[in-house]
């Protein structure tokens, strides 16, 4: 057995073995395990021309990240002359490449060749929540705000980086048992140069490679307070919603080939490199988190300012309707209702602006949500 090694033979190679001959890759594993948890509490004092009191705030956050990778280092056997296979069992290539001029001899078992995909998986999640309240020295709450957020990242990758195979100029080896090539190859210089005899046949299967990752994050703020002029409690409302997402999905194929016999049979030793569509793992958890968090900040800031502009525009329309001498009182009431908070026109504007801010269905729904529950946007 040869594992993760490179062998170079200048002359001929004789495999005179009663059992199996196995060439395989060396496999390495990598693990990432992380978790975090934090909390905080603070008290301060505030004062302005109308109110004074204590500011109390508290926050908590927790999360985790789990990743696992598998990497393979193929064995390589390079023979300058003829490779004589006198094997009583199977010739097994499990993550290996055999190159030479000519292959001959008898294999009483099968040729079993397969490529090993490298793999990588990751899953992570973060949550946070915070509350802040202003309480007057008289014990009466002046305002309260709550923020909560969540972000998630998931990734999955499996792809062959170096294909398993046998690359010769010619071959007349005889194989007794049914053979199999999984994302692997047996090539010669031309189809006519491959005189290999598979007494019980040969089957080929291709390997489907994939790379998928997805991350998303959302942050929601709610607030309520006492109007400084009316001293009445304002109903709770959404003070800001931010949403972000990032992701990618790609696939490729690692093809099998036995020159002139099976699979992509037109492939020869000269162009064997065309069989493996290399797929790079472009996932970077730090970049994905940075991207989604940036989108959250932008959409949340946009969402805080845009509703105010909608409210101002709607109020101008209401004022124009009230001043329109061509409308009856009933018509004015009907039109004003459409432009009031929760009215069909204003909700439509919020929804459209939400889509502009995030470019997604989610952000459009966020915009609609602000419209339906935003009595504070006029303050």
Each language-model region and where it sits:
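Binding/recognition "hotspot" determinant
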Residues: 1-357, 377
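Transmembrane helix interruption/hinge and helix-loop junction motifs
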Residues: 358-363
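Small-residue-rich, membrane-active alpha-helical segments
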Residues: 365, 369-378
């Amino acid at each position: 057995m040869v594992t993760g090694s490179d062998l170079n033979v200048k002359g001929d190679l004789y495999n005179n073995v009663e059992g199996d001959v196995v060439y395989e890759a060396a496999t390495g594993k990598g693990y990432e395990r992380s978790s975090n948890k934090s909390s905080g509490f603070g008290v301060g004092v505030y004062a302005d021309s109308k109110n004074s009191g204590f500011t109390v705030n508290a926050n908590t956050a927790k999360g985790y990240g789990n990743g696992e990778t598998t990497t393979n280092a193929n064995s390589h056997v390079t023979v300058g002359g003829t490779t004589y296979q006198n094997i009583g069992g199977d010739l097994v290539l499990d993550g290996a490449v055999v190159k030479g001029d000519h292959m001959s001899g008898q294999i009483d078992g099968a040729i079993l060749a397969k490529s090993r995909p490298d793999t990588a998986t990751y899953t992570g999640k973060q949550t946070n929540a915070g509350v802040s309240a202003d309480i007057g020295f008289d014990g009466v709450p002046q305002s309260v705000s709550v923020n909560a957020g969540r972000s998630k990242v998931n990734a999955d990758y499996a792809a062959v980086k170096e294909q398993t195979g046998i690359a010769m100029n010619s071959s007349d080896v005889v194989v007794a048992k049914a053979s199999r090539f999984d994302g692997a190859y047996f090539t010669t210089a031309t189809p006519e140069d491959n005189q290999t005899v598979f007494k019980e046949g040969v089957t080929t299967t291709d390997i489907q490679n994939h790379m998928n990752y997805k991350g998303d994050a959302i942050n929601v703020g709610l607030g309520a307070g006492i109007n400084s002029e009316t001293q009445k409690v304002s109903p709770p409302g959404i003070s800001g919603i931010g949403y972000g997402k990032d992701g990618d999905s790609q696939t490729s194929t690692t093809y099998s080939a036995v020159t002139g016999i099976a699979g992509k049979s037109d492939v020869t030793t000269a162009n064997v490199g065309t069989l493996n569509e290399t797929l790079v793992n472009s996932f970077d958890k730090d970049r994905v988190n940075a991207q989604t968090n940036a989108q959250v900040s932008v959409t949340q800031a946009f969402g805080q300012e845009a509703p105010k502009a909608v409210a101002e525009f709607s109020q101008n329309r209401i004022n124009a309707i009230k001043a329109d001498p061509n409308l009856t009182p009933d018509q004015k009431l009907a039109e004003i209702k459409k432009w009031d908070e929760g009215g069909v026109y204003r909700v439509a504007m919020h929804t459209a602006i939400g889509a502009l801010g995030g470019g997604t269905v989610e952000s459009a729904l966020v915009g609609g949500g602000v419209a339906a529950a935003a009595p504070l946007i006029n303050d």
